[in-house]
């Protein structure tokens, strides 16, 4: 890899580290091409990416960035998984690591917060952005319908009273 390619790689990593919701680092030693392809496909389904990186270039790209504390994790054969959704990459990697002991999660970062493997595991158990939005909107809609019912109750009671008076007048 010549200097120009290295500079381009550092620029690409700068963009990844700046724009990703979360970045997870993992050792992939011993994984077959088929296993890595399967992992990449699972990540792609959730908008994530799995990329093998050169440690020295990743450390250079992290200098002065919010996730700079995670630079120590770049030792040995390291790949990064990242996604815009801050829980997508951790969820897929933790799930995949349970079934494949060749993938070892080292840690990761989300903005300024650096996590070890246990932190990534905890992050993977959080609901995704879409799940949070669905939960919040369901709660808001439930409360809105309760308010509407309470506002309509007096009018419904008045309509019922008018019907009773009309029935008595007709009889």
Curated annotation (Swiss-Prot):
Gene Ontology biological process: translation
GO molecular function: large ribosomal subunit rRNA binding; structural constituent of ribosome
Protein keywords: Ribonucleoprotein, Ribosomal protein, RNA-binding, rRNA-binding
Cystine crosslinks: none
InterPro entries with a match to the protein in the record: Ribosomal_uL10, Ribosomal_uL10-like_sf, Ribosomal_uL10_bac, Ribosomal_uL10_bac_type, Ribosomal_uL10_CS_bac
Coiled coil, from the record: none
Domain of life: Bacteria
Gene Ontology CC annotations of this record: large ribosomal subunit
A Pfam family per the record: Ribosomal_L10
Entry similarity comment: Belongs to the universal ribosomal protein uL10 family.
Function: Forms part of the ribosomal stalk, playing a central role in the interaction of the ribosome with GTP-bound translation factors.
Subunit-level organization: Part of the ribosomal stalk of the 50S ribosomal subunit. The N-terminus interacts with L11 and the large rRNA to form the base of the stalk. The C-terminus forms an elongated spine to which L12 dimers bind in a sequential fashion forming a multimeric L10(L12)X complex.
Protein's recorded name: Large ribosomal subunit protein uL10
Organism encoding this protein: Maricaulis maris (strain MCS10)
């Amino acid at each position: 890899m010549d200097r120009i390619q290295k500079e381009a790689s550092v620029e690409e990593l700068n963009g990844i580290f700046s724009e990703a919701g979360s970045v997870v680092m993992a050792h992939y030693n011993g994984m077959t091409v088929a296993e890595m392809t399967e992992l990449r496909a699972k990540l792609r389904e959730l908008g994530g990416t799995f990329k093998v990186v050169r440690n020295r270039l990743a450390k250079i790209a992290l200098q002065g960035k919010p996730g700079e504390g995670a630079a120590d994790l770049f030792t040995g054969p390291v790949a990064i998984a990242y996604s815009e959704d801050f829980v997508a990459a951790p969820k897929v990697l933790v799930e995949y690591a349970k079934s494949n002991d060749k993938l070892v999660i080292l840690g990761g970062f989300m903005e300024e917060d650096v996590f070890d493997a246990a932190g990534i595991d905890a992050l993977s158990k959080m609901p995704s952005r879409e799940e949070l939005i669905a939960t919040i909107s369901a709660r808001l809609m439930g409360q809105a319908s309760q308010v509407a019912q309470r506002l309509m109750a007096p009018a419904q009671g008045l309509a019922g009273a008018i019907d009773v008076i009309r029935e008595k007048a007709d009889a």
